[in-house]
Regions:
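Alpha-helical subdomain
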Residues: 1-64, 69-70, 156, 161, ...
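Conserved Class I S-adenosyl-L-methionine-dependent methyltransferase catalytic core
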Residues: 6-28, 32-38, 46-47, 53-160
Length: 327
């Protein structure tokens, strides 16, 4: 008789139940309602405006997963929920969960098709303004950690102007310019994203030092006269050939000595670790036909496009910074 069990299969297959329970609890505002004090089931149901029976289902599922604690007849946030999902701290991952629930999760229904056809099946669907805001705010939320780590781990004192290509709503530029007051920044993004970025940066103290330019990385002229160029969460959108083309385009716009700073979910050479990076390859495939890459592959792009690899700097979790210098 074998000791092998199907536990791994069952636990993995149940992953969609765990994520949808978490997404629903977040959208209902469960963790916000428990941010200030523990609540009974009836109090929770009343505050959420849902029946007591369904309030019990969602709350007990969150207890089972470790997001809530239950003592006697009262529910309270666990430390992780209070920190990241209650809205009471700057480390707010609620927008990220909304992004995965409303934008990413529906796309994953097409994973098998994407695997069979070797192309994204959702990337051509245009986001409406509300979806674009959910997308942009969600990406900014999950990138907040590595974005704030970057100016602490990479020294920008040698630079004067930073160009963030595909810069979202400024999640990387803002902490960099805040930490290094000598810098000026340019955010280059697609037109729908720049509208969200303008709103996000309007009241930010570093906003006046950021020039927002709308354009396409491959179709429009890239801004010139920058000596640091950021590609954060960009290369996973494209295949090898397209990434080499992008790096060549950037190299043509800068002088020798300028640096390109590529932030992404880099994997080991086998593309099997870290776990999150290996899994998120499916996210990029289904959405835009993209992929995750290894540090070695980035070095190969550099050799072929006029850059010299300098170093890799871990930022946070599975996200690292790969640095190249124009030669």
């Amino acid at each position: 008789m074998t000791d092998t069990t199907p536990d791994l299969i069952l636990q993995t297959a149940a992953g969609f139940m765990m994520s949808k329970h978490l997404f629903a609890a977040n959208d209902l505002g469960l963790f916000e309602k428990l941010a200030d004090r523990p609540l009974t089931l009836d109090e929770l149901a009343n505050d959420l405006s849902i029946p007591s029976r369904t309030a019990r289902i969602t709350a007990d599922a969150m207890v089972a997963l470790g997001f809530l604690e239950k003592q006697d007849d009262r529910y309270r946030n666990s430390s992780v929920s209070q920190t990241f999902l209650s809205g009471k701290t700057p480390a707010d991952l609620r927008p990220f969960l909304r992004f995965w629930n409303h934008i990413s999760y529906p796309q994953w229904q097409h994973l098998e098709e994407a695997l069979r056809t070797n192309r994204g099946v959702s990337g051509d669907v245009e986001l409406d303004p509300d979806q674009q805001r959910i997308f942009s705010e969600g990406v900014a939320a999950i990138q907040a950690g590595p974005a704030h780590a970057m100016p602490e781990k990479y020294d920008f004192t040698r630079h004067r102007k930073v160009l963030d290509l595909g810069g979202g709503v400024g999640e990387y530029l803002v902490p960099i310019l805040d930490r290094f007051p000598q810098l000026e920044g340019t955010l280059f993004e697609l037109p729908p994203v720049t509208e969200v970025a303008r709103d996000a940066l309007a009241a930010n103290p570093v906003g006046p030092r950021i020039n927002i330019v709308a354009g396409d990385l491959f179709e429009d002229a890239l801004p010139e006269d920058h000596d640091a160029l950021i590609l954060a969460n960009v290369v996973h959108y494209f295949d090898h050939a397209r990434n080499r083309e992008l790096l060549r385009r950037i190299r043509e716009r800068v002088l020798a000595g300028a640096r390109v700073l590529i932030v992404d979910f880099w994997t080991n050479p086998q593309h099997t670790e870290p776990l999150f990076a290996a899994l998120v390859a499916g996210e990029f495939l289904t959405s835009v036909g993209g992929d995750v890459y290894s540090e070695e592959e980035a070095k190969g792009w550099f050799r072929e496009t006029g850059w010299e690899y300098l170093q890799t700097i871990p930022l946070e979790g599975p996200i690292s910074l790969v640095v190249g210098e124009a030669i």
